């Protein structure tokens, strides 16, 4: 009886490990005001094309701000007024990648940027 319960628990744990969601951001750096930067996010562990995705940022004051949203197929995007016209979110579902093109950067754009599912 105990062996059976242990086996079920082990299978569930292993299944969870195999399905670990990973989002790995890259492309950050130091840029002068007015400059541009493109961020990338490599996704794994889930069916990327089935999910809407977003970029969020944490300011030096530790405030969390939503930056951009894109629908699962990429046809719809939304931005707050603070970045509208300067930031562009896009995705490549074949490569499981999310992107954020940032231009006309301002000092208030200084933050840690994260992709989110």
UniProtKB/Swiss-Prot annotation:
InterPro entries: Ig-like_dom, Ig-like_dom_sf, Ig-like_fold, Ig_V-set, IgHV. Transmembrane segments: none annotated. SMART domains: IGv. Residues 86-117 are annotated as: Framework-3. The keyword Disulfide bond applies. One of its GO terms (biological process) is immunoglobulin mediated immune response. GO terms for molecular function: antigen binding. GO terms for cellular component: extracellular region; immunoglobulin complex. Residues 50-54 are annotated as: Complementarity-determining-1. Residues 55-68 are annotated as: Framework-2. Disulfide bonds join 41-115. PROSITE patterns: IG_LIKE. Gene3D superfamilies: Immunoglobulins (2.60.40.10). Keywords: Adaptive immunity, Disulfide bond, Immunity, Immunoglobulin, Signal. PANTHER family: IMMUNOGLOBULIN HEAVY CHAIN. This is Ig heavy chain V region 5-84. It comes from Mus musculus.
